[in-house]
Amino acid sequence: LLLDLLRLGAYQLLYMDGVPSYAAVSQTVQQVRSLAGKGGAPLANGVLRSLEREGGDLDRFPPFETSPLEHLTTWGSHPPWLLRRWLGRWSPDQVRSLVELNNAPAPVYFRPLGVEPGEARDRLREMGWEASLLGDGIPCLLLGSGTDPALLLQEVPGIVQDPGAALVTLYAHPEAGIRLADLCAAPGGKALALAHQGAYVLAADPSLPRLRVLRENVERVGGRVWVVAARAQEPPVGECPMVLLDVPCSGTGTLRRHPDARWRLTPETLRELVDLQERILEGAAPLVPAGGHLVYATCTLEEEENEGQVRTFLARHPEFHLKETGAVPARYLDEMKRLRVLPQETGFDGAFAARLERGS
């Protein structure tokens, strides 16, 4: 705790021009005294006073041009093992863009449901809120800074949803009136959106608190969504013409929304997630009839959770094949017509999806 408080104080001294140095030092020392014990207060005062006098030598960061890994580890505050993976796939400049985005405040997007985005934007502007259309047929609005989503949700039916997640539902492209099982549903944004795209959705998840939030959202915005408490490995449904698996994943495409996640993730937990995803896929495959679709989705950037997982599944299940619908612009698709949204290219949260059709 003492180290964390010192880090916060140092950050205020070095990077927050709006906080006077004396205030950063005194407030941090007070917090140390009240939260970490009186004994730590003199140490905190001495460390921060020294930092105030000497300043932080930002030139001590390894140069990006010659040492991108070391630079991005220190300056960008990302774990080296994760950066090594990214530098093995993308250029140093692309990885730096991703790191910068992960460290920046996340924008807030609103997806109106039952109301066209243009109409929702006009209504919000009439109420004094700033909102902008995105283009590319993405049904989300970018909200201006300072907009309170909680107040907005009381005025216009919809959900807070990043365009990356919205593109997953567009890519799934359910036919009107189709029965769809969302087996990893909570907190339910995709289930609600798919219902408003015309599907009859069975939303299953083992988390009761998160399902309560989903039920409240269904009551608020409407939609043909039936909520069930169940594990994806034990599907609460028989044969279903469309199954969505928005599986638990490492979430490396959404690190800007969860700043601590980069430090909690380890290679071991990544391997455990890959095993879990494989089990969920295997459990869901028998539910899909001939001509039906299995949509596998994540919010991670990691190859073994995305392309690798789909490749392994198709090798075991030759009765399935990739089936793209043309429902999203080509710029969001990879060479195999799978959905791939990269934050460093789009500014959106990362997303991946593959639409798999069972042959007749």
Language-model segments: what does each one mean?
Residues 1-360:
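S-adenosylmethionine
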